[in-house]
């Protein structure tokens, strides 16, 4: 949020009372602020970069560059981080190599978020001195590269022992903001730090969460918001006044049709393959995203990742789907979060899957709380549909048999451990472990005179 520039007085585009903060309208509110204990993109999107910072950050090209570490030296699998001087946490405590070491160990030993696996290659952490940290990573060049990249994401969030007891209510980091108020399902209010090491932070911040895109757009129209981030209804673009600027970027978001690999009928790979051939992904893109999404060929990899396969694994082929079902008419329930994209896509899935022989029931659940508890944590579902927007999340999704997909393939785990992500993706797609319907676009709307956010989502932060 600190990057948002306001060339005009706030509320200049409407009749709202003048404000001295930056207001971002978003969807998908976090159920809590502690992203160390559970998956989900909303909490890190709000906190990483705003409250928490990382030793390296990921630039617009997808490369890790120095951040809290002003310099990174690499000798094979040994990384030496030289930390910036003058960086402090919001409580005034200086940021040191001890804090960096603590943060890495905390991921390894205390996190329950599946992304903690990104820290598995670390075999040694040494505090050389107050401003120098040395980390040893094993697994070969690919694994080492992947680890360094992950250190620019939520996994690399730098914390302090004094802050971990209040991760859910008062997160403490080195970033430009502190959390002033968290209203579950409604908003996160931020205070700008006057002592931020990176320079002046001009305005306080507020992220407001809206259940529907029309309400978010209306807030922008009347001056109650400055930016709509990740607008979920592309069809509204043509209705906007000319002075509202629209940018469309790419994301890490795989709109994933998940199939519980441990529960019938999806414990049969041929049934999963039948689903993959039965779904017309191009139709989903047109109806849900006005054609603005990117088709990944069904693979759970955005085009910006180095191992993007760039081919169609499951072309739309209803006859092939019927052949794989071999006369069976499986009864399935798709548990659908109450998000606009998911609701619209599920209606298409309903008709497409019924056309090849599935008996389909749609079950709508509240997102995030109910979906997280029932599907992600409870694994109480047959099929579901959600946008997974965590960056480079193939290991989390498909490398852990205890994850909600229930996908268990030792070959895939070996390839992930060896850094052979392309090979892992090939096997995942051969098994039809899940189907990516689209790589979701990021639609950003700006009020007049507002700019500064990059619409291309490279990591997990806003």
Located regions from the model:
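Gly/Pro-rich hinge or "lid" segments in bacterial periplasmic/extracellular proteins
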Residues: 149-200
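Periplasmic-binding protein-like
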Residues: 262-304, 344-345, 424-433
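N-terminal lobe/hinge region of extracytoplasmic solute-binding protein
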Residues: 26-76, 105, 172-173
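Structural transition elements
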Residues: 290-324, 339-344
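Periplasmic binding protein-like
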Residues: 24-25, 92, 351-402, 421
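Extracytoplasmic/peripheral linker and loop segments enriched in polar/acidic and small residues
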Residues: 14, 359-370, 396-448, 454, ...
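Surface-exposed binding/hinge segments that line
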Residues: 73, 78-80, 117-159, 180-181
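Ligand-site clamp/hinge motif
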Residues: 193-238, 359
